[in-house]
Amino acid sequence: MESSYVVFILLSLILLPNHSLWLASANLEGDALHTLRVTLVDPNNVLQSWDPTLVNPCTWFHVTCNNENSVIRVDLGNAELSGHLVPELGVLKNLQYLELYSNNITGPIPSNLGNLTNLVSLDLYLNSFSGPIPESLGKLSKLRFLRLNNNSLTGSIPMSLTNITTLQVLDLSNNRLSGSVPDNGSFSLFTPISFANNLDLCGPVTSHPCPGSPPFSPPPPFIQPPPVSTPSGYGITGAIAGGVAAGAALLFAAPAIAFAWWRRRKPLDIFFDVPAEEDPEVHLGQLKRFSLRELQVASDGFSNKNILGRGGFGKVYKGRLADGTLVAVKRLKEERTPGGELQFQTEVEMISMAVHRNLLRLRGFCMTPTERLLVYPYMANGSVASCLRERPPSQPPLDWPTRKRIALGSARGLSYLHDHCDPKIIHRDVKAANILLDEEFEAVVGDFGLAKLMDYKDTHVTTAVRGTIGHIAPEYLSTGKSSEKTDVFGYGIMLLELITGQRAFDLARLANDDDVMLLDWVKGLLKEKKLEMLVDPDLQTNYEERELEQVIQVALLCTQGSPMERPKMSEVVRMLEGDGLAEKWDEWQKVEILREEIDLSPNPNSDWILDSTYNLHAVELSGPR
């Protein structure tokens, strides 16, 4: 007995300092965030849960922590906040994502943000920040995304930023910056888009020479090469020998110079690039233009063994570039039309400007007279659909925390497409197969922007319905009219895929006299109060029933028959974060009860899809607790 007591005392002495350290860390981070809350004006009570009496800020909405209860993410984008930032944010040593975009925050950017050495993404765009960009931000050695555009920042661009070798995306446009734009280090990768609309910036990338520097020489005019015959497998039906010879003569000097330069860089490769047709007036952002030959080699001649998937837009191939980087090459199938090259370049530019951690980032493109290809990073963990239904026995199933993270991440990506792209982008084919998973199983929305881009109108009528059966919103299928709410419907079905593990449309369910449409099948089980039967068997009982019910509630709100009644994706994000779901669900229940009482007839245009859009009794699920 005495020895047991001694062991207990020793363990207490060992563990108590660690516990004290954790409390101290949590208190510091909580105090810093509460200080931020005090200085911000919050008209929508977004920060209501930031209670200083709670030691651990990990319980607060819009705050994410790691397993050690350290804050790693603060998400307060598009929250209508005003006020200013506080230097105390510098104590969040493990913070990776600071998202404060699209608010009305004023004042300077605190130099203490340079202490956040684990920061990966700093998004302060679309605010009213003033003053200089802190030199201390150059210490953020892990930073990949730095977006300070659309503020009122002044002064010069700190040279220290060029030392951030990990920097992939930089946007300083639409400010009041002045002086020379650095062109060394990581800044050598960036194009005029990163610095646009800063009238007092100068340097080669801005096309405004700095005082005392020689004027820029305009580039020589580009001579369009004639079509060159290629192997018949790529659809060229012939070429005129004289034209080829003339084209070769005209372009002799350019390929020779390119070849000599290329040989100095890559002496072991056996192919070289020739100039491709390109409109010099179209800027393509921070994109690499690949040659067709380069992508042919990377994919082993677009071999069938390298096919990752097939879809309505074409096939996707796995490829390995000359430097060893794995990529996914999407080979688009489309009819060639007059002016199609310019349209393709314009759409590629729009896609490239949609940069968010939950969106699949376009790495480059290839355009020839016969081919259109897009190059993306390779996602080793595949898609949500493959992880749910096609995983090998050696791969563990997606657990419930991962599924929740996928739901929230994909919602954030779609919200960015709808609310922060100009023009906004409507996906039109949201489904589990188009939600990819990176190395950390973070959701990455793919295949966006491949349908026609939205203009500034609220809706767009297309000549062909894009999408997958089971995911298509009823109004889109019947009228061809799409909007953001079309994506919301598809997202709701994707949530049901996450919960059930099943396909959105599956004829195999007929064997059990079940509905082939996943939405109808789920509603049928809910009417029979068989919640446990719709849960993916791979989850077993390893999930929180309350959280499961809340995700189902969000899915049902997203799949309402009327697009006007569906929430926006930004509202979906807030509901998944725990903000506003109870009110939305209660409001929806009242509407459903009213429909039953007055026997409200459904829209006659939607009679055929009645089971998928109406008549779910309001008592199927308990409200949020």
Curated annotation (Swiss-Prot):
Location in the cell: Cell membrane; Endoplasmic reticulum membrane
SMART domains the UniProt entry points to: S_TKc
Residue list for modification Phosphothreonine: T325, T337, T346, T402, T459, T462, T463, T468, T479, T541, T559, T613
TM ranges: 239-259
Start and end residues of each stretch annotated as Leucine-rich repeat receptor-like protein kinase binding: 59-78, 97-102, 123-126, 145-147, 171-194
Modification(s) after translation: Glycosylated. Important for targeting to the plasma membrane.
Effect noted on mutating K330E: Loss of kinase activity
Cofactor(s) essential for the protein: Mg(2+)
Its membrane topology: Single-pass type I membrane protein
LRR repeat spans: 92-116, 118-140, 141-164, 165-189
Residues found modified as Phosphoserine: S291, S299, S303, S352, S383, S386, S394, S415, S478, S483, S606, S612, S622
Positions contributing to ATP binding: L308, G309, R310, G311, G312, F313, G314, K315, V316, K330
Signal peptide bounds: 1-26
Function text: Dual specificity kinase acting on both serine/threonine- and tyrosine-containing substrates. Phosphorylates BRI1 on 'Ser-887' and CDC48 on at least one threonine residue and on 'Ser-41'. Confers embryogenic competence. Acts redundantly with SERK2 as a control point for sporophytic development controlling male gametophyte production. Involved in the brassinolide signaling pathway. Probably required during small peptide (e.g. RGF1) signaling. Involved in the perception of phytosulfokine and subsequent signal transduction.
Note: Seems to be related with early development of tissues in general rather than with embryogenesis.
Record-linked PANTHER family: SOMATIC EMBRYOGENESIS RECEPTOR KINASE 1
Entry protein name: Somatic embryogenesis receptor kinase 1
Organism name: Arabidopsis thaliana
GN (gene name): SERK1
